[in-house]
Swiss-Prot record:
InterPro entries: P-loop_NTPase, Thymidylate_kin-like_dom, Thymidylate_kin_CS, Thymidylate_kinase. The keyword Kinase applies. SUPFAM superfamilies: P-loop containing nucleoside triphosphate hydrolases. Its EC number is 2.7.4.9. Keywords: ATP-binding, Kinase, Nucleotide biosynthesis, Nucleotide-binding, Transferase. It comes from Dehalococcoides mccartyi (strain ATCC BAA-2100 / JCM 16839 / KCTC 5957 / BAV1). The gene is tmk. This is Thymidylate kinase. Phosphorylation of dTMP to form dTDP in both de novo and salvage pathways of dTTP synthesis. The lineage of its organism: Bacteria, Bacillati, Chloroflexota, Dehalococcoidia, Dehalococcoidales. The keyword Repeat does not apply. Pfam families: Thymidylate_kin (PF02223).
Amino acid sequence: MSLFITFEGGEGCGKSTQSKALYRYLKKKGLGCVLTHEPGGSKSGDKITRLLKWSKEEHISPLTELLLFNASRSILIDNVIKPALQDGKIVICDRYTDSTLAYQGYGRGLDLDTVKCVNSLASGGLVPDLTIWLDMDDKAALLRKGELPPDRFESENNGFHQRVRNGFGAIYATEPDRFLKLDASLPQSEIFSRIKQRVTILLGCRNE
């Protein structure tokens, strides 16, 4: 039974922690499951990620970001996500098209319809069955990152991160049925309990 689940949110909201926890939980239940992430998730995609996050040699415009993120996405979908879904597996992806719309559209100010069009082209119209949005105050979330050196996006000003958060809110408002919105400031155990509950319901519906 194939299922496509994505995790979304700003920097430091706990997406990686919760996506890994869900992956381990589903594997223990004996379900075929694949855990991946954006940007990257493939050898070629990881090279693009390093350019996007850490390059300081050349200016990378918002449009270039949009195109590079979607080039990485297209590779990931063709080589990881689609094959796994075709095999009837559950795919968990840390970030997907909503992040691009929130960051490059709302955050960077690119035309939203253009971002949606490029996203759709690169993804082949593949839409998640469930998107888990971990929402948190951007300042508090960035404090979670600790003393690790910030990448190009983490080092952006508070205004940028607030626009990104508002962007996720706008996306959620247009497709609330696809989303599970959670307060990322809650204890990790409580967040995961709510995720398990929603995924269990979704799995039950798919098995009927």
